[in-house]
Amino acid sequence: MSWRLWLKSKPKSVNLGFYGEVNAGKTTLANKIGKDWADQEVGVVSEIPHETRSIQKLEKVNFAAKGTKLDLTLIDMPGIASSVNPKDFMRHGLSANEAMERAKEATRGIVEAIKYLENVDVALVIVDATRTPFDQVNFTILGNLEHQSKPFIIVPNKIDLPEADIRLVRDAFSEYPVVPVSAIQGDGIETLYDKIAELARKMR
């Protein structure tokens, strides 16, 4: 395709879903992509667990990499957890009532995120590279993605931190595409963009 035809070609619409454990950096990465390509952020980042308790979207993100133009919708999912304990919120200063309500919202968000997977075209599975990747949550997410034949990328995040262990994540998910990044520093982000474009090109 000539560059003139490429400029005129209509971008492919892609729903890009951000999945992962609580506080793995999903929203930080979604915000990074949103700022890079649309000068907008998707959601609020917080140290309090389950800050994202409902699906958040940023539409009409004009993305281009490796000769591929995409019309992205960034879909930031609530963090997935095997259980939600109100005490985790109380440790961050919330009252008992506030913590209980937040726990209910977080639980609903987890269910919503899994159900919404059918609407996702490509998924980024964000893994905290400073924690063990051998967590049931990660394998639950991957199992759901594979069951629905969704293309995805494993994204070890926080690689700028000294305790990050990229090799361990690669070993844990050796059969899958793995692209390490630092969502805060921007390390590895261009490689991730290329991989997103590559998967999108293979979509029907």
Positions of predicted regions on the chain:
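Charged, alpha-helix-enriched surfaces in structured cytosolic catalytic cores
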Residues: 24, 50-53, 108, 186-187, ...
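Active-site-proximal flexible loops/turns
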Residues: 38, 83-86, 135, 164-167, ...
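Conserved C-terminal guanine-recognition region of P-loop GTPase G domains, centered on the G4
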Residues: 101-176
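Conserved, well-folded catalytic cores of nucleic-acid-processing
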Residues: 36, 61, 80, 148, ...
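Conserved nucleotide-binding/hydrolysis micro-motifs of P-loop NTPases
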Residues: 51, 79-81, 130-132, 158-162, ...
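Conserved G1/Walker A P-loop phosphate-binding module
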Residues: 1-93, 97-98
